[in-house]
Amino acid sequence: MRTGRYIGIMSGTSLDGIDVVLAAIDEHTVAQQARYCHPIPMPIKQQILAMCQGQAVTLSRFGQLDTRLGILFAEAVLCLLQQTGVAPHEVTAIACHGQTVWHEPEGVAPCTLQIGDNNCIAAMTGITTVGDFRRRDMALGGQGAPLMPAFHHALLAHPQERRMVLNIGGIANLSLLLPGQPIRGYDTGPGNMLLDAWTWRHRKAPYDKDGRWARSGQVHQSLLQHLLADDYFLRAAPKSTGREYFNLGWLERKLSRLGPVPAQDVQATLVELTARTIAQQVLLCGGCEHLLVCGGGVRNPLVMNRLSALLPGIEVSPTDKFGVSGDDMEALAFAWLAFRTLSGLPGNLPSVTGAREETLLGAIYPVMPATEKT
């Protein structure tokens, strides 16, 4: 087993920053030791958003963005090392998920694309880097997502209790940790993505702090029904989605079927959409005793309150109460996946992704021992 210290990097679909964590990992434990959040410059964020929504881009601009993100990820790691006093040679590997700019798991040639050049990360830090975690699963017929349920099971499953883990990032995804049943998980639909995009358009703020703007509006029932009628919510698992599907263009097409709707009412309706689509899936799967929530959405009290109201009898709690940082869950998960890859262990779950078999995940970008920086 390649036990040791690992660094995980995650920027996520919300684009609210680059989360970097340092953790000591072995076969049985993941012990977080430090965290750091690195800002994403607005020009880079805007380029990513444009690409995710299908805007044309030259190969030159695409390549430059790939390099710039790789450099930015490396700088985030170097800041964490400086903050902690940990030397590069003390770190076994870096795990970098990369920034998803396209995810298309269906069709004749399924594909997923994460950018942020791992060569830049390995070269600038002198640390072996593991990246490109999703495409091997997809090559075996899987969705390439979600990859979190295996990690959720390793850290948060209980032998008797029915538990589900909900990650509310840009997209919301659910992991079913039900005793005696195969581990399952899938994307329920939009999490913070539409809420943040709508807030930026109308308030020029990165997110709706504490759901205050949404509280000033009312749920528009006709709009809500139009949104809930989308085919994605009716599809059976395994399924996964992203910004290339749930974006402002999607919302505007739904709005075009109605008369004018006040912006604050749209925001209130989007909160209800997120909560309702999550709650429906929890109940469809037979419910649970504990719904453990992580990701940025856990800090939106309006979303959390709606989940509690829609799921009576289920304890809705942050994963922090169970010993795992909700803010750092995804970065920790990819650090753990890198540990599994370097240890020769599979990282995917066919019961979750639909892949034909278990497999190692990720590509390894090694460094020469002589280049390790002290």
Swiss-Prot record:
Pathway in which the depicted protein is active: Amino-sugar metabolism; 1,6-anhydro-N-acetylmuramate degradation; Cell wall biogenesis; peptidoglycan recycling
Alphabetized UniProt keyword annotations: ATP-binding, Carbohydrate metabolism, Kinase, Nucleotide-binding, Transferase
BP-aspect Gene Ontology terms: 1,6-anhydro-N-acetyl-beta-muramic acid catabolic process; amino sugar metabolic process; peptidoglycan turnover
Residues reported to bind ATP: G12, T13, S14, L15, D16, G17, I18, D19
First-tier enzyme category under EC: transferase
Listed CDD domains: ASKHA_NBD_ANMK (cd24050)
KW Kinase (keyword) present: yes
Tagged with keyword ATP-binding: yes
Gene3D superfamilies: 3.30.420.40
Catalytic activity: 1,6-anhydro-N-acetyl-beta-muramate + ATP + H2O = N-acetyl-D-muramate 6-phosphate + ADP + H(+)
Family: Belongs to the anhydro-N-acetylmuramic acid kinase family.
Role noted for this protein: Catalyzes the specific phosphorylation of 1,6-anhydro-N-acetylmuramic acid (anhMurNAc) with the simultaneous cleavage of the 1,6-anhydro ring, generating MurNAc-6-P. Is required for the utilization of anhMurNAc either imported from the medium or derived from its own cell wall murein, and thus plays a role in cell wall recycling.
Name this protein carries in UniProt: Anhydro-N-acetylmuramic acid kinase
Organism (species): Sodalis glossinidius (strain morsitans)
